[in-house]
Amino acid sequence: MSDSGQECAFVVDGLTYRGIEWGNPEGPLIIALHGWLDNALSFSVLAPHLAQFRLVALDLSGQGHSDHRSADATYHIWDDVPQLLGIVEQLDEGSVIVMGHSRGAAIAVLLAAALGDRCSHLVLLDGMLPIPAEETAAPQQFVQAQRDREAARTRRRRHFTDVAGFINARVKLGFSESSARLLAPRALRPHDNGFELTHDPRLNQASAVKLTAGMIAAFYASLSVKTLV
């Protein structure tokens, strides 16, 4: 397998998840989940150090080259889990190492809980489950999600005249120039003599429901897997 990895794709529940596979096809399987508005290329720097593993880095739904969810769907951190379980089944491995970065780390915790004993190790990079929500804030959170959804109906997709425009925009958000340049091939697609973002704009919307402190503690307590944070 080349240093640049090999494209892969999985169809589950009518959604196509695309990604990149690196390493040893016969090695222990790692499912790698990227952060918010990133894509599978965020693991390309780490991949050479994991050459003995079968590293499958996925573009989560609505990001990179993977399908967007249907118009009536949402992007809560648990929404990808059923499809990720389906991908694990398609890969047909007895056990799996789950690795996630940032938002992907939160999803990784939920996936590990759902996999149970099939998850041999859990690796959380710069993230865990989200900061817990106060129960009293639930109505406000729910209403904000509805407002965001309504506002998005008339919002135009971000457009860039060139790749440099995307890189500069990411740098202004606090990302390094090198990381922005790394992600660009899967973060952009050609459009109107320039480029537009590939991610679903709904990923910018507030979640309608968030986990409370008690719920988060219960998820952590349910895990018995070896975990690296």
PLM feature spans:
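Helix-loop "lid/cap" segments that line or gate small-molecule binding pockets
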Residues: E150-R155, G165-S176, R186, Q205-A208
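Conserved HGGG/HGGXW glycine-rich cap/lid loop of the alpha/beta-hydrolase fold
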Residues: R18-H68
